[in-house]
């Protein structure tokens, strides 16, 4: 690819507005299902990769080389979400705020409390319940007897 052609492609890159446009322009294969589910996460990851790339660069560089680095960054971004989930990367604040907390308990903080066994005391025998009486009467006559009323 010539430098002038790459410069034109860089101008097109700056006008991209969808994830698909980036993938097509940089000639990166993708599964539309993966992109549909992880679109925002891939684009955020890609943006972070580009910031890192530009922070480490000291000069503008050759447009051909820059496009190659952009392509590599997009491939890394896409592959990051084919091998792990959005929850694994936690790129967005809402996911960072809900990050799992550590559940570590040091062994030194565990104590054992030994209880002395108690022997149950025998209880007084209860009054036998007549078969016609029950704790939950099932009809109105039994209910009146149970509540102390008359039939």
Swiss-Prot record:
Q: What Pfam families does UniProt report for this protein, alphabetically?
A: NifW (PF03206)
Where are the annotated segments for Disordered? 115-151
Q: Which InterPro entries does the annotation name?
A: NifW (IPR004893)
Q: Give the record's subunit note.
A: Homotrimer; associates with NifD.
UniProt keyword annotation of Cell wall biogenesis/degradation present: no
Q: What does this protein do?
A: May protect the nitrogenase Fe-Mo protein from oxidative damage.
Listed under GO biological process in this entry are:
nitrogen fixation
UniProt keywords, alphabetically: Nitrogen fixation
Q: Does the keyword Acetylation apply?
A: no
- Which organism does this sequence originate in? Frankia casuarinae (strain DSM 45818 / CECT 9043 / HFP020203 / CcI3)
Q: Which family does it belong to?
A: Belongs to the NifW family.
Protein name as it appears in the record: Nitrogenase-stabilizing/protective protein NifW
């Amino acid at each position: 690819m010539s430098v002038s052609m790459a410069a034109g492609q860089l101008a097109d890159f700056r006008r991209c507005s969808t994830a698909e446009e980036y993938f097509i322009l940089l000639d990166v294969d993708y599964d539309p299902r993966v992109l549909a589910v992880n679109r925002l996460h891939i684009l955020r990851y890609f943006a972070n990769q580009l910031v890192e790339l530009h922070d480490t660069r000291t000069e503008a560089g050759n447009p051909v080389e820059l496009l190659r680095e952009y392509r590599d960054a997009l491939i890394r971004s896409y592959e990051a979400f084919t091998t792990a989930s959005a929850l694994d990367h936690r790129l967005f604040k809402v996911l960072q705020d809900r990050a799992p907390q550590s559940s570590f308990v040091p062994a030194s903080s565990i104590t054992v409390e030994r209880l002395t066994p108690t022997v149950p005391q025998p209880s007084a025998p209860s009054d036998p319940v007549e078969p016609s009486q029950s704790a939950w009467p099932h009809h109105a006559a039994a209910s009146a007897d149970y509540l102390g009323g008359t039939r």
